[in-house]
């Protein structure tokens, strides 16, 4: 006997199905209607029978897409966000506050007054001070063209230190300049002490003392487990000359090849102690000047001194010291490949400089 087409199809499907049927079907035990008529009530987290109202399941999770805010959604004053703003680790408040919504018509003035009164009552004074300081730090970093990572590191250092008793009596400018210098050291962004000093009206001695205090505070808090900051870059002393060279070469319009040659000179000048005791800026200026002479570039020592904020005599004196050890500080591959020649370097003497024959 042949089976109907529908029955044969069901038999074929059941024959292909292997293993247990894991489909979960929720049905009402009271109504016993199939297919069941159930309703998901996400507001209560329940699944109920639409016929008798019996709760079939509870504590369900709403898997639908969340409300989203688009650029033009605030035209009517509505904000669909239900989770509030993201927490800011640089502030101390928990950011859990009640916000009074906007009203239309005659109630607008009342809600505005309520918002003003509430803001005065719940504002955290400490957070206000931190935000004002962060705004000043951001402005100073922007003036020095520092990247965002330096700003964040400086703000983190400021938050850890600004309430310390040992900083009482120190000016805010000296503290901010010091934390910016800390941020530069942590992010390995080359900035000299003189460049940071130019952002403030504070004496160099005061910033130096404040920087030492902040450095000790951060190291102590890190050792005690109150902070997780790598202080190795902060406590290593002066920034190396090689970190300044790429930026100053860029300001002078020099190529990468010249910058690399200057970095090589600055790095290997330490091996012969030819410029021992000189500041990193002085070493960088002398190395850049020597590299420009090697490549026969028309860059005067006056221009280099103005760019690096040193005297012209400092540039020439540094070059004179490097010239005496030129075979040890200049990259030998440049000479061997014929890219540059020793004759390109002006010969120096105690009296004057003259061109080598």
Curated annotation (Swiss-Prot):
GO terms for biological process: transcription initiation at RNA polymerase II promoter; transcription preinitiation complex assembly. InterPro entries: Cyclin-like_dom, Cyclin-like_sf, TFIIB, TFIIB_CS, TFIIB_cyclin, Znf_TFIIB. A zinc finger (TFIIB-type) spans 23-57. Gene3D superfamilies: 1.10.472.170, Cyclin-like. Residues 69-90 are annotated as: Disordered. The keyword Nucleus applies. Transmembrane segments: none annotated. Pfam families: TFIIB, Zn_Ribbon_TF. Zn(2+) binds at residues 28, 31, 49, 52. Keywords: Metal-binding, Nucleus, Repeat, Transcription, Transcription regulation, Zinc, Zinc-finger. General factor that plays a major role in the activation of eukaryotic genes transcribed by RNA polymerase II. Associates with TFIID-IIA (DA complex) to form TFIID-IIA-IIB (DAB-complex) which is then recognized by polymerase II. This is Transcription initiation factor IIB. It comes from Kluyveromyces lactis (strain ATCC 8585 / CBS 2359 / DSM 70799 / NBRC 1267 / NRRL Y-1140 / WM37) (Yeast). The lineage of its organism: Eukaryota, Fungi, Dikarya, Ascomycota, Saccharomycotina. The gene is SUA7.
């Amino acid at each position: 006997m042949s089976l109907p087409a529908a029955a044969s199809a069901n038999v074929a499907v059941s024959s292909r199905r292997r293993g247990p049927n894991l489909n979960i079907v929720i049905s009402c035990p009271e109504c016993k209607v199939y297919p069941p008529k159930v309703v998901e009530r996400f507001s209560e987290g329940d699944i109920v029978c639409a016929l008798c109202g019996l709760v079939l399941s509870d504590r369900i999770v709403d898997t639908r897409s969340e409300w989203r805010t688009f650029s033009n959604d605030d035209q009517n004053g509505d904000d669909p966000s239900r989770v509030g703003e993201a927490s800011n680790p640089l502030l101390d408040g928990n950011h859990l506050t009640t916000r009074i919504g906007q009203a239309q018509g005659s109630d607008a003035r009342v809600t505005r007054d309520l918002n003003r009164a509430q803001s005065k009552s719940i504002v955290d004074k400490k957070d206000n001070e931190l935000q004002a300081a962060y705004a000043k730090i951001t402005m100073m970093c922007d003036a020095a063209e520092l990247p965002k990572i330096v700003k964040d590191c400086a703000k983190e250092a400021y938050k850890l230190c600004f309430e310390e008793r040992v900083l009482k009596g120190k000016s805010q400018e000296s503290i901010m300049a010091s934390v910016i210098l800390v941020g530069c050291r942590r992010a390995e962004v080359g900035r000299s002490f003189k460049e940071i000093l130019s952002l403030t009206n504070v004496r160099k001695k005061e910033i130096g003392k404040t920087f030492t205090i902040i450095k000790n505070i951060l190291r102590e808090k890190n050792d005690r487990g109150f902070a997780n900051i790598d202080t190795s870059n902060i406590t290593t002393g002066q920034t190396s000359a090689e970190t300044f060279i790429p930026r100053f070469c860029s300001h002078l319009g020099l190529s990468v090849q010249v910058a690399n040659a200057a970095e090589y000179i600055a790095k290997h000048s330490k091996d012969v102690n030819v410029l021992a005791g000189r500041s990193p800026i002085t070493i960088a200026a002398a190395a850049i000047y020597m590299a420009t002479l090697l490549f026969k570039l028309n860059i005067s020592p006056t221009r280099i001194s103005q760019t690096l904020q040193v005297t012209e005599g400092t540039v020439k004196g540094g070059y004179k010291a490097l010239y005496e050890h030129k075979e040890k500080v200049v990259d030998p591959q440049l000479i061997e490949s014929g890219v540059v020649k020793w004759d390109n370097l002006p010969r120096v003497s105690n009296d004057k400089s003259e061109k080598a024959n």
